[in-house]
Amino acid sequence: MQEIENLHKSVLLQEVLQAFAPLEKGVFIDCTLGLGGHSKALLSQKPHLKLIGIDKDKHAQEIAKERLKAFEGCYHILSGGFAKRFKEALETHGEQIKGVLVDLGVSSLQLDDDNRGFNFHSHALDMRMDLESELNAQKVINSYCIVALEKIFKDYGAIKEYKKIAHHIVERRAKKPFKDAKDLSDFLSSLSKNKKIHPATLVFQAIRIEVNRELEELKEFLQDAMKLKGAILCVISFHSLEDALVKNAFKNYAKNCICDALNFKCTCSNNHALGEILTKKPITPSLEEIKHNRRSRSAKMRVFQFKP
């Protein structure tokens, strides 16, 4: 277990604890429990909270249970996608929910596991958070039509040469299907001379988002989160697509006027804000944290306080 403590470093841990410092009692939902790092630290400080942890990854759940042993009876783990499970928890617990955390990153345990296919050197081409899901990276890269590949590379990777990359992938797989992540990564490296970032980075991001429905799930969650009352919502994102969704959702939550933009005059009474944004700019990791955990460098945390 000490090996897990050393391997997995919860991103922006102190900042998360600070965000939820006002909490004393009630239900806390960790929508992306992972290995339980954030939840363990929070329960250590707030023993009167009741934790609901949600995760798709059953292996991660087992590790989280082991790490949360000291809090037996204070937590409950739900398996599945966080949008669906959060909606169910919201219907059950309503205004008892006082805090919600969403950490959209992939854990080091998943990234470093060669059998999961998340890293460039994996001898697998999978990328599923939920290993019971039917769609995996191999199906995407070896069977999606060129138009579908272009769309996910453009929409989920913001790749400038999305047409060219999709064309080369389809051309190559016709001769020999991609067998693992290393095979795909090496092929992508042969197409690009970009030295700033690994040529496979954005393609892998796009495929992972597609396989796990990451943006759709985040959109669904943010829509349901509007129903929270008196709760603190904290979301940690790791790329601009996620952060833009969170930023825009929080702006909409904080809007007083909901009149049509074409209206010359407000007729809605101008008091529809659901709460306030507590982070005018996103909180990012300190240089010290990045030094000890390079994977934290792209993290951005936004916090919203809902009115009772």
UniProtKB/Swiss-Prot annotation:
* Catalysed reactions, as listed in the record: cytidine(1402) in 16S rRNA + S-adenosyl-L-methionine = N(4)-methylcytidine(1402) in 16S rRNA + S-adenosyl-L-homocysteine + H(+)
List ligand-binding residues for S-adenosyl-L-methionine: G36, G37, H38, D55, F86, D103, Q110
Instruction: Tell where it localizes.
Output: Cytoplasm
Q: Name one GO cellular component term.
A: cytoplasm
Kindly indicate whether the keyword Ribosomal protein belongs to this entry.
no
Q: What is its EC number?
A: 2.1.1.199
Q: Which Gene3D superfamilies match?
A: Putative methyltransferase TM0872, insert domain (1.10.150.170), Vaccinia Virus protein VP39 (3.40.50.150)
> Which controlled-vocabulary keywords does the entry list?
Cytoplasm, Methyltransferase, rRNA processing, S-adenosyl-L-methionine, Transferase
Q: What is its main location?
A: cytoplasm
Output the Gene Ontology terms for molecular function.
Answer: rRNA (cytosine-N4-)-methyltransferase activity
Q: Please give a single GO biological process term from the UniProt record.
A: rRNA base methylation
Keyword Transmembrane helix appears in the UniProt entry: no
Superkingdom to which the source organism belongs:
Bacteria
Tell me, what does this protein do in biology? Specifically methylates the N4 position of cytidine in position 1402 (C1402) of 16S rRNA.
Give the family per the record. Answer: Belongs to the methyltransferase superfamily. RsmH family.
Kindly provide the name given to this protein in its UniProt entry.
Ribosomal RNA small subunit methyltransferase H
Which gene specifies this protein's sequence?
A: rsmH
